[in-house]
Amino acid sequence: MWRDLERICQADGLALALPPVRFPQNGLKAARLALIGEPGGWTPAFTRAVFAANYAEQKDIGDNATLRTILAALGVDDDAAFAAANTPENKDALKRQTEEAAARGLFGAPSFTIGDELFWGNDRLEAALKWAATPKA
């Protein structure tokens, strides 16, 4: 698994430090923050920074200080982000997304769904895009 991840990171220009100091990590706080970042448009940059903190910098992505540092570097008000992430509404929204993923049969990342079709794995992205572009009868 790690060698495969190393090849993918090399191909995509992503830093990776192996072996990981912590694996697996608790990504719940990061997931809650990513969800509230969607309306503001900072979720992609946040996600990439969390990936780097986890896999390149060997930081604890469940630690509030790590996440606050990432948010601050993105120009996001970390106090406001944490407050919004921890509301019952946001927690429920993440639970709903997780339940939907389970109901659709998602079991790993990355997974893609086009309608009811499930594509799993980074190497299946092109197939998912092709499927999405193909007219269905």
Residue ranges and their predicted role:
Residues 49-137:
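C-terminal cap of thioredoxin/glutaredoxin-like
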